[in-house]
Amino acid sequence: MDLFEKCRKFTAAKEAIESGIYPYFIPLNENEGTEVVFQGKRLIMCGSNNYLGLTTHPKVREAAIKAIERYGTSCTGSRFLNGTLAMHEQLEKELAEWVGKESALVFSTGMQTNLGTVSALISRDDVIVLDKDDHASIVDGARLGYGKI
């Protein structure tokens, strides 16, 4: 029995590419956050995590450059394993002040963010409509919220 026979028989992706309807790895000419240029046409980007378009905001870019100059390109791991930096504490302090609370704690991952936020927003009497392609963290957050899915 050939373990890879099933893989060789799977041709849907190849057929989609050949027919020009493959939706992945689309080559973009420009990426301006909430808009992209594809084959010379400016389009709205609906698949991005840049919901507010802040990745291209001049103040965000400037702050990112300063952070890279001070800390490098990453923290190289989560706060749980590699420690909390001053910028983590500063962010939490500023967030707490902004919402008028004594303190704040930011989530360390996108998964945790969606689980915590979505589950907190949904109560037993709420109904949530999910897209079949929603990230697992959104679906799990909805389930944790006890609402009707």
Language model segments and positions:
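N-terminal "arm"/small-domain region of PLP-dependent enzymes with the aminotransferase-like
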Residues: R8-T73
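Conserved N-terminal alpha-helix of the aminotransferase class I/II PLP-enzyme fold
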Residues: E62, K66-G110
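Short glycine/serine/threonine-rich phosphate/pyrophosphate-binding segments
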Residues: V106, M111-T117, S137-I138
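Conserved PLP-anchoring active-site segment centered on the Schiff-base-forming lysine
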Residues: T117-A136
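Short, structured coil segments at secondary-structure junctions
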Residues: G100, R124, L144-Y146
